[in-house]
A protein has these predicted regions:
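The start of beta-strands in P-loop NTPase/AAA+ ATPase cores
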Residues: 53, 90-91
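Short beta-strand segments
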Residues: 34-36, 58, 92-96, 158-161
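Conserved beta-strand-loop surface patch within small alpha/beta domains used
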Residues: 19-73
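Gly/Ser/Thr-rich loops at beta-strand to alpha-helix junctions
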Residues: 37-40, 97-101
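Divalent-metal-activated hydrolytic enzyme cores
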Residues: 1-27, 62-64, 70, 74-88, ...
Length: 178
């Protein structure tokens, strides 16, 4: 039996509720979330995000990559096209304590992973989330310096603490425009 079977069973129950119908393409909360793919870091759980509230991108470390920038640019352009006069959204970059990408700081782990994948060790080391507040600041700065993002897109940075369950704001949206 597939390991996905229990989730497919849950899908049948979800589909029977009908809550998925009639939803607007534009997110209700005007927030775009970028966070880690760690299963302990689910925005539906720690932020109470519900269906159609916010687009969510999850990757290793919740890091800003070229692919993430392009996805945000696409959603921004789509939002501006669909609602030319409406406000755009805030991108919330959320890193967390105890991130598994911290293993990339270990030379032996990084070297083995680089050998296995062909990825550059220096680039891998830069992806390690050891100090989530520092990496959030770096990723917010990277987003703000991107020429492909619409200037009306606000960016903020946050750290989710796995021990306390609390999210702390590291970069306020108002700071990015100062």
């Amino acid at each position: 039996m597939s390991k996905l079977r229990p989730l497919l069973d849950r899908n049948r129950a979800f589909a029977a509720t009908g809550v998925h119908t009639g939803l607007d393409l534009m997110p209700r909360l005007q927030v775009f979330l970028l966070t880690c793919l760690d299963p302990r870091v689910d925005p539906a759980a720690f932020l109470g995000v519900e269906l159609a509230d916010a687009p969510v991108i999850r990757n290793a470390g919740g890091r800003v990559t070229e692919a993430v920038i392009n996805d945000i640019a696409f959603i921004g352009y789509l939002a501006r096209t669909m609602k030319p006069d409406g406000p755009l959204f805030e991108v919330a970059v959320i890193h967390h304590t105890g991130c598994g990408t911290g293993f990339l700081a270990d030379a032996a782990f990084r070297s083995g992973f680089a050998a296995r994948t062909g990825l550059d060790e220096t680039e891998l080391a830069a992806e390690a989330v050891i100090d989530p507040a520092a990496t959030v600041r770096a990723d917010v700065a990277r987003l703000l310096s991107s020429p492909v993002l619409l200037p009306e897109i606000s960016v903020s940075g946050h750290v989710y603490d796995l021990q306390t369950g609390l999210v702390t704001t590291v970069v306020e949206p108002s700071e990015v425009w100062a």
